[in-house]
From Swiss-Prot:
SUPFAM superfamilies: Initiation factor IF2/eIF5b, domain 3, P-loop containing nucleoside triphosphate hydrolases, Translation proteins
Disordered as annotated region, ranges: 38-294
Region G5: start-end pairs: 528-530
UniProt-recorded Gene Ontology molecular function terms: GTP binding; GTPase activity; translation initiation factor activity
Function recorded in the entry: One of the essential components for the initiation of protein synthesis. Protects formylmethionyl-tRNA from spontaneous hydrolysis and promotes its binding to the 30S ribosomal subunits. Also involved in the hydrolysis of GTP during the formation of the 70S ribosomal complex.
InterPro entries xrefs: EF-G-like_DII (IPR053905), IF2_II (IPR044145), IF2_N (IPR006847), P-loop_NTPase (IPR027417), Small_GTP-bd (IPR005225), T_Tr_GTP-bd_dom (IPR000795), TF_IF2_bacterial-like (IPR000178), TIF_IF2 (IPR015760)
Organism: Syntrophomonas wolfei subsp. wolfei (strain DSM 2245B / Goettingen)
Entry GO CC: cytosol
Spans annotated as G1: 392-399
Protein name per the record: Translation initiation factor IF-2
G4: annotated segments: 492-495
Residues forming coiled coils: none
Residues reported to bind GTP: 392-399, 438-442, 492-495
CDD domains the UniProt entry points to: IF2_eIF5B (cd01887), IF2_mtIF2_II (cd03702), mtIF2_IVc (cd03692)
Length: 882
C-alpha cells in the first residue's frame, strides 16, 4: 500500500507542515513530525474530513443584525442593554470584568494568551493618548493582529456562531472590559479578509495606568457588516477548551497570523490534557465525535507474504501496532524485535489470530524463474527416451544387469564389487534409446536412491531369486511409491540352483505388489544378468510401459534438468553429470544450479565422447562450473545477466539462513550447550570423489552419534585432501577421512609434521566401522571390582607423624600394596579409600598372603578399631563398545 508524507499532504492542501501535524494529531492519527508517513487511505479520509467541514461551515447561516441594534450601537448605548432585551442569545451577554489579580475560570493557556494580547494593547493606547482636538483616534483593537481567514474544519456545532447555543458552549475567551462589543469579521470557511469598516471618533481621556481597557463610554461604536454575527463577549465563567470532536482551527483558509500562532503555541498546554474531556452539550452527541469513533482501520481479509517478513512489515500489512504483533509473538514463545525477520509459518500463525488468510507471494528469484519457464504446446512435444532407474538391495545384481544391457563391465571398476556412485547411461535397443540410472543398494546410500526415484520415468526393482526381499528392497519400494512412478520387478539370478521366483512373488504380495498372472497390475520379468536370459523381454516391457505413459518433451526450447552427480576433478575442475529432462542444451549456454553457475564449455556423454548438444533424456558431463553443484539440484538455462542476478539472490538468502543458525543464545540454550559440553565429541573432516558419496558417508557417520559421544563433521567437500584441510584438522583436533581420494605431497608432509590422523577408504562400510571404533575409545570405560583378600584388625599402634597403624591378620586371600580398601565394622562399610602403607614387621611389603600378620596404614583414616575387617580389592577397566 502506497504512503504519503505529512509535508507532501500539507503542500497539497496549502497548509504549513507544522499545522498539518497538529491537524492530524487532533484527528487521532499517530504522526510525530512532518516526515511521518500515513497511508493513502488515511490521506483521502483526511481530505474528505476537511472538505466536509468546509461545506458545513458554508451552510451555517450568519446571524443578521437588526437596524435597532445598529442604532443603539451608534447612539452609544452599552451592549448590556441590548443583551438584556435579548436574554435568549447568550453570546451577547457581557459580565463584569474580573478584578486584576483574580483568576477567571477557563484554561490557563487561553488566559495567558489574553494577557499577552492585553499587553500589546497597552502600548497602543499609550501611544494614542491625549490627541489634539479634532483628531481621530482609532480603536485600540485596530492595530492588533487579526486573522485573515477562517478554519475550514469548523462545523456548525463547534464554531460558536449559532444563537441558540447553551451557556458555556465552546467559544473564544476574550478578557475585555464589561460591555465591550465583539469584533466582527467574516467567519465563513475559506473567505478572504474583509476591510475594517469601524467608525472612528475623537479620542477620550488617557487610559488609567493600571493598563485597563477604555470603558464602554470611551470606546467608539463599531459598525457591523450585515450578514455577519458579532463575536461573543467574554465572561469569567467561559472556557475555551475544545471539545474532543471539534476540528482544528489552523486549516486552509483560516490560518492565524504569525504573532498569534507563536503566542498560542508558547502559552497553550499540550493537546493531550483536553483530549479525554467532553465539552459537548448534554443529551446530544457531537457529529465529529460520531465520526471519530468510526476511525478504525479495518484488518484486511487476505495478505501476501514472501518466504520471510519483518515484524514491522507484518504489522503494517495487518494494520496493527508493531508492539501488538511483538506481544502476540511473545505469547507464542518467540522473542522477536521490530526489525527481526520471522518465517512464513510464524507469520501465518500470527495472522490467523486476527482471522486473516495468508498467501505465499513469489519471491524475486521465483518471479525471474517464472519468466524463464516456457509453456510447451502439445504440437511441439515429441516422444523422448524413457529414464529408467535400477533399484534394489545391495548385491542383488543391479549393476551386473546393467552391464549385460550395456555390454560393458562396470562392476569391475567399483571397489568391493558394490556400487558407491550413482551412474547414468544411455543405450540403444532396436533404434530406441533408453537412459538407465544405476543407484547404490548399500544402506548408507538412502539419499541417492531417493534422488534416483525422483528423476526417473520408470523404475526396475531388482530382487535376487535366491535371497528374497531385504531391507533395502523395502526401502526402494517406499521411494517408488513416494515418487509415484510406474515400475516393474526383475527377478534376477534365476540361473542359480537355489533360485525360487515364486517365493519372491509371494513375499512382494505382502507389500501390495501383485503380479499380472495373479490378477495384479505389476509386470514381473525373470532374468539372469550372468547368462543374459530374459534381458530382451525386460527391454520390451520397458518400452511398452514408456509407450503407455506417453513420455514426451520439446527439444526446441531452453533446456532444464537435474544434477545426477557432482565431483571435483584435479585436471578438469568442477564437473557435474546432468540429465536433461526437457529442451536442448548447447555449448556456450549459461546454466545455474543452486548457488553455482556455469557456461557450458564441454559436454561428454556416458561413453566418454564429446558432444555439441544434449537432447532430452540424455546424460552428459558438464565442465566449467563455478563450484561443485549439489546432487539433485535443478539446472536451468538462462542468459548471463539473469544468472548472476539469481545467484546473488540465492547467496543473500543463504547468508540470512546462516545468520539465523548462529543467532544469539538464550539462557535455556546456554544451559543446553553446557550439558552438551559434557558429551564427548569426535571431530571429522570428510573429502570424497563425488558429491553423492560424500553426502552418503556424512549421513551414515552422523547416525552413529549416541548420548555420550557425538560426531561433528566440521567440513565435507569434493576433491583431494589439501594442505588447507590439514591445517583445519590441526586447529580443530579432527580426523581426516578420504573416500576414494588421496592427499597431495604437501598435505601428506604437513599431516606428518602435525601428527594429524588421515584415513583413506575405498569401501564405505570400512570407514563406518573405523569411526565406530574411534567413538568407542571416547566412551568412559566400565570398571569391574576384583576381590583380593581380608584382614582382621587385632591391635592398634600410634606412630608419630604417621597416624594409626592397624596390626592385622590376613584371614582370606592377600593384601596388596596400593590396593583399594574398605573398612567393615559389624558388616557395615565405615570407610573406603587407599592403602598408604603395608609392612611385615618393620619392612615394607609388596603383598601379604593368608595366615600372615602385617601392619596396615589407611590413607586419611585413623578411626580404626580392634575387630574391624579390612577388605582389599582392585578395579579392572573394561572397554566399552557402541
Amino acid at each position: 500500500m502506497a504512503k504519503i508524507r505529512v509535508h507532501e499532504l500539507a503542500k497539497e492542501l496549502g497548509i504549513a507542515s507544522k499545522e498539518m501535524v497538529e491537524v492530524l494529531v487532533e484527528l487521532g492519527l499517530d504522526v510525530k513530525n512532518h516526515m511521518s508517513t500515513i497511508e493513502d487511505s488515511q490521506a483521502s479520509w483526511v481530505k474528505k474530513r476537511l472538505s466536509k467541514s468546509d461545506e458545513d461551515s458554508k451552510k451555517q447561516p450568519a446571524q443578521p443584525v437588526t437596524r435597532d441594534e445598529a442604532v443603539k450601537k451608534h447612539s452609544g448605548e452599552p451592549a448590556t442593554q441590548t443583551t438584556q432585551k435579548k436574554p435568549d442569545n447568550p453570546r451577547h451577554v457581557s459580565g463584569p470584568r474580573p478584578q486584576e489579580g483574580s483568576k477567571p475560570s477557563g484554561s490557563t493557556g487561553r488566559r495567558e494568551f489574553s494577557e499577552n494580547r492585553e499587553q500589546s494593547r497597552k502600548g497602543e493606547e499609550r501611544h494614542s493618548a491625549n490627541p489634539r482636538p479634532g483628531t481621530q483616534m482609532k480603536s485600540p483593537r485596530n492595530n492588533a493582529p487579526r486573522p485573515t481567514t477562517r478554519p475550514e474544519n469548523r462545523s456548525a456545532g463547534a464554531t460558536g456562531r449559532t444563537d441558540n447555543r447553551a451557556p458555556g458552549a465552546a467559544g473564544r475567551t476574550d478578557n475585555r472590559a464589561p460591555g465591550a462589543v465583539g469584533r466582527t469579521d467574516n467567519r465563513g470557511a475559506g473567505s478572504a479578509s474583509r476591510p475594517d469598516n469601524r467608525v472612528t471618533r475623537p479620542a477620550a481621556g488617557r487610559p488609567d495606568n493600571k493598563g485597563s481597557r477604555p470603558s464602554d463610554a470611551k470606546r467608539p461604536p463599531q459598525r457591523t457588516v450585515p450578514g455577519n454575527t458579532p463575536r461573543p463577549v467574554s465572561s469569567p465563567e467561559r472556557t475555551t477548551e475544545k471539545k474532543p470532536g471539534e476540528a482544528s482551527r489552523t486549516l486552509p483558509g483560516g490560518a492565524k497570523t504569525a504573532g498569534d500562532k507563536k503566542a498560542f503555541r508558547k502559552n497553550t498546554p499540550a493537546f493531550g490534557q483536553y483530549q479525554s474531556k467532553d465539552y459537548s452539550r448534554p443529551g446530544r452527541k457531537s457529529k465529529h465525535k460520531r465520526k471519530k469513533e468510526n476511525i478504525e482501520f479495518q484488518t484486511p481479509e487476505n495478505i501476501k507474504i514472501e518466504g520471510s517478513i519483518m515484524v514491522r512489515d507484518l504489522a503494517e500489512k495487518l494494520n496493527k501496532n508493531p508492539a501488538e504483533i511483538m506481544k502476540k509473538l511473545m505469547e507464542l514463545g518467540i522473542m522477536a524485535t521490530i526489525n527481526q525477520n520471522i518465517d512464513f509459518e510464524t507469520a501465518e500463525i500470527v495472522s490467523s489470530l486476527y482471522d486473516v488468510k495468508v498467501e505465499r507471494e513469489l519471491s524475486e528469484e521465483e518471479k525471474i524463474l517464472e519468466e524463464l519457464v516456457d509453456i510447451d504446446d502439445d504440437a511441439e512435444l515429441i516422444a523422448r527416451p524413457p529414464v529408467v532407474t535400477i533399484m534394489g538391495h545391495v548385491d542383488h545384481g543391479k549393476t551386473s544387469l546393467l552391464d549385460r544391457i550395456r555390454q560393458a563391465n562396470v562392476v569391475s571398476g567399483e571397489a568391493g564389487g558394490i556400487t558407491q556412485h550413482i551412474g547414468a547411461y544411455q543405450v540403444t535397443i532396436k533404434n530406441n534409446k533408453i537412459t538407465f540410472i544405476d543407484t547404490p543398494g548399500h544402506e548408507a546410500f538412502t539419499a541417492m536412491r531417493a534422488r534416483g526415484a525422483n528423476l526417473t520415468d520408470i523404475v526396475i526393482l531388482v530382487v535376487a531369486a535366491d535371497d528374497g526381499v531385504m531391507p533395502q528392497t523395502v526401502e526402494a519400494i517406499n521411494h517408488i511409491r513416494a515418487a509415484k512412478v510406474p515400475f516393474l520387478v526383475a527377478i534376477n539370478k534365476i540361473d542359480k540352483p537355489q533360485a525360487d521366483p515364486e517365493r519372491i512373488k509371494q513375499q512382494l504380495t505382502e507389500y501390495n505388489i501383485v503380479p499380472e498372472e495373479w490378477g495384479g497390475d505389476t509386470i514381473f520379468v525373470p532374468v539372469s544378468a550372468k547368462s543374459g536370459e530374459g534381458i530382451e523381454n525386460l527391454l520390451e516391457m520397458i518400452l511398452l510401459v514408456a509407450e503407455m505413459n506417453e513420455i514426451r518433451a520439446n527439444p526446441d526450447r531452453a533446456a532444464y534438468g537435474l544434477v545426477v552427480e557432482g565431483e571435483l576433478d584435479k585436471g578438469r575442475g568442477a564437473v557435474a553429470t546432468v540429465l536433461v529432462l526437457n529442451g536442448t542444451l548447447n555449448i556456450g549456454d549459461y546454466i545455474i544450479c543452486g548457488t553455482n553457475w556455469c557456461r557450458v564449455r564441454a559436454m561428454i556423454d556416458d561413453r566418454g565422447k564429446r558432444v555439441d548438444k544434449a537432447l532430452p533424456s540424455m546424460p552428459v558431463e558438464i565442465m566449467g562450473w563455478s563450484g561443485v553443484p549439489e546432487a539433485g539440484g535443478k539446472v536451468q538455462v538462462c542468459d548471463e545477466k539473469v544468472a548472476k542476478e539469481i545467484i546473488g539472490l540465492r547467496l543473500s538468502e543463504k547468508k540470512i539462513e546462516e545468520q539465523k543458525q548462529s543467532s544469539r543464545v538464550s539462557l535455556d540454550e546456554f544451559f543446553q550447550q553446557m550439558k552438551d559440553a559434557e558429551v564427548k565429541e569426535l571431530t571429522l573432516i570428510i573429502k570424497g570423489d563425488v558429491q553423492g558419496s560424500v553426502e552418503a558417508l556424512r549421513q551414515s557417520l552422523l547416525r552413529l552419534a549416541t548420548n555420550e559421544v557425538k560426531v561433528n563433521v566440521i567440513h565435507s567437500a569434493v576433491g583431494a585432501i589439501t594442505e588447507t584441510d590439514v591445517m583445519l584438522a590441526s586447529a580443530s583436533n579432527a580426523i581426516i577421512i578420504g573416500f576414494n581420494v588421496r592427499p597431495d605431497s604437501k598435505a601428506r608432509k604437513y599431516a606428518e609434521d602435525e601428527k594429524i590422523d588421515v584415513r583413506m577408504y575405498r569401501v564405505i562400510y570400512e570407514a563406518i566401522d573405523d569411526v565406530k571404533k574411534a567413538m568407542s575409545g571416547l566412551l568412559d570405560p566400565e570398571y569391574k571390582e576384583k576381590f583380593l583378600g581380608r584382614a582382621e584388625v587385632r591391635a592398634l599402634f600410634k606412630v608419630p607423624h604417621v597416624g594409626v597403624i592397624a596390626g592385622s591378620y590376613v584371614i582370606d586371600g592377600k593384601i596388596q600394596r596400593n590396593a583399594s580398601v574398605r573398612v567393615l565394622r559389624d558388616g557395615v562399610i565405615v570407610y573406603e579409600g587407599q592403602l598408604s602403607s603395608l609392612k611385615r614387621f618393620k619392612d615394607d611389603a609388596k603383598e601379604v598372603v593368608e595366615n600372615y600378620e602385617c601392619g596396615i596404614g589407611i590413607k586419611d583414616f585413623n578411626d580404626v578399631k580392634e575387630g574391624d575387617i579390612i577388605e582389599a580389592y582392585t578395579l579392572e577397566e573394561i572397554p566399552r563398545e557402541l
